Amino acid sequence: MIGFVIIMQKKIIIDTDPGQDDAVAILLALASPNELNVLGITTVAGNVPLNLTSKNARIICELAGRSELKVFAGSDSPMFRPLITAEHVHGKTGLDGPILPEPKMSLQDKNGIDFLIETLESHEPGSITLCCLGPLTNIAIAIEKAPEIITRAKEIVMMAGAYFEVGNITPAAEFNVFVDPEAAKIILNSSVKKTFLPLDVTHKLLVTKAQIEAFESFGTRVGQVISEMLQFSERFDKQKYGSDAAPLHDPSVIAYLLKPSLFSGRFVNVEIETESLLTLGMTVADWWGVSGREANANFIGDVDIEGFFNLLTERLASL
């Protein structure tokens, strides 16, 4: 008797601020068409300003041979605060390292926030997962403009926050949350299912020299670009942490959707600090259940490191 495994394709929207690690995450999603149906990509200001994140998303789509995908520019600033960027990590373009051509794809005329609202409204409730790789501004503004859409999303899976690993942009805060803490708070206060892939996980996903060599061994343009991008962005974290390897953040979101068994965590209460000057953007995760506050998010705390990199390498080699 021959058995068949039925793979249910997940509809996703990628909300992103590319960023080298965002680029790898997008490539991982595009290398997994049997499991993931990318309905569109919305960009947000974060690692670099909006004009560059919108350009970079199109560059990556073309690199993957997926120029039919639609990229929509969202918010160019946080909801209530001036924009903080991370060119010191990602370079002036956000994708520093390799020499990349100008994209031929056109940026869509429709605003990314309107695309989010209209797409969620037009699809069956509970059928779309929002994959957030950057500051959460676009999603929060969409919720503010059309509160009913949040009941239509299946889940928000986000690379955001930290608890045991504290912060990477300040002593207390992870970058994506720190850039727009009010946006993160709006999402936490919503009824949608939420999963955090925090620094507690991504700081375990260290790109070693051997992993860089594995990307190069593909013998493809994609493999070479990934190698050159990560070697550029890694230099900052290697110096900061005194390590010979650096964390790979955003691909954890896509890997979680592809193979959730690689990850483990707890359903706990998570709150975002929005008032303190000292701890602004801090992700307060009640890991030990001592606050008495109601649990509101799935907070991932551990990952099968070997399994993650095996999945990443296998999929990216197909591009």
Model-predicted segments: where are they?
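Short, Lys/Arg-enriched N-terminal segments with co-localized hydrophobic residues
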Residues: 1-7
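Conformational coupling and interaction surfaces
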Residues: 8-9, 28-31, 35-38, 178, ...
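Active-site histidine-anchored catalytic micro-motif
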Residues: 9-16, 20-59, 93, 100-203, ...
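Metal-dependent C-N hydrolase catalytic cores
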Residues: 10, 52-123, 295-303, 313-317
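Generic secondary-structure signature for well-ordered alpha-helical cores
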Residues: 34, 62-67, 76, 121-122, ...
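Acidic/polar N-terminal loop/beta-strand segments that form early-domain functional surfaces
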Residues: 43-46, 74-76, 275
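Short, mixed-charge aromatic SLiMs
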Residues: 48-52, 56, 80, 162-166, ...
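A residue-level signal for conserved active-site and pocket-lining positions in enzyme catalytic cores
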Residues: 71, 187, 254
